[in-house]
Amino acid sequence: MAEVTLLGIAQDGGRPQPLCQKPCCANVGLDERAFPTSMGIKFEDSSTHLFDATRNLGDQLNIWQENLPSHVWLTHAHFGHVDGLGLFGRETIGAKGIILHVSKQMQELIQATPQWAIMLEQGVFTLEVFATGEEISFESETIIPLLVPHRDELSDMHAFIIRGKEKSLLYLPDHDTWEETLSLYGCKLIREWFEKFNINAAFIDGTFWSQHELSGRSQEEVPHPPVSQTIAHLGSRLPSDAEVFFIHLNHTNPLYDKSSSAFKTVESMGWKIGVQGMKLNL
């Protein structure tokens, strides 16, 4: 069966976040660091698939304990999900022939960005373009990209469903609102959407706990459905529900603190917070 390793649980800036001197970052020890969200999967055919390429690529490959990924899948163009691409290049790893799976908009951005375009010329990456809803089949697994609404200044955003022999996993690190995402697929409830795509486990956007978490800037600039809202929509977990793990946590998110009321509320309702290095079998 396919083995999933969660390689990071933080929002794009990681934890601690650069220049943050608040208590949420100032007291974070080395063993408490959280890397930007990423995921690695080893398929039954021994191919290795990295989802999102962060600046902490080296640390995350050490967590994964695999050699270079044979495939890289990008959700979108926001920096925390792509700024590790350069580490595969001539100046660092010097990789060759990695298959880079992207949307059409992401393909156009990569080809128009000199530091990425030269990596195509050097053979570091070979581009494969996917379409939303397309089933991309491997020996025992299938990957399905799903378009979801999220700030699209540079490219669109895709979640991924990974279907193994026994389970299906949803990887949804970012989206704007549940209303927009569910509406796009003709659904009104989160459970309904999970059931529509036969999801057994999900890594989903947990960027903020509440709508009032950021100080000094409007949260409307960085829309994400707050975890408190998501669990209010879901209610307590039922035996038939998918396992849900919240990921992509902003450095301000109280879910990092296991003693917080937020953490205890999520756990008491049967949902979970992703753990860096955790594994799932599909």
Regions found by a protein language model. Give the residues of each.
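Core dinuclear metal-dependent hydrolase active-site scaffold
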Residues: M1-W64, V129-L189, M278-L282
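Active-site neighborhood of divalent metal-dependent phosphoester bond hydrolases
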Residues: T92-G97, K104-V129, T252-P254
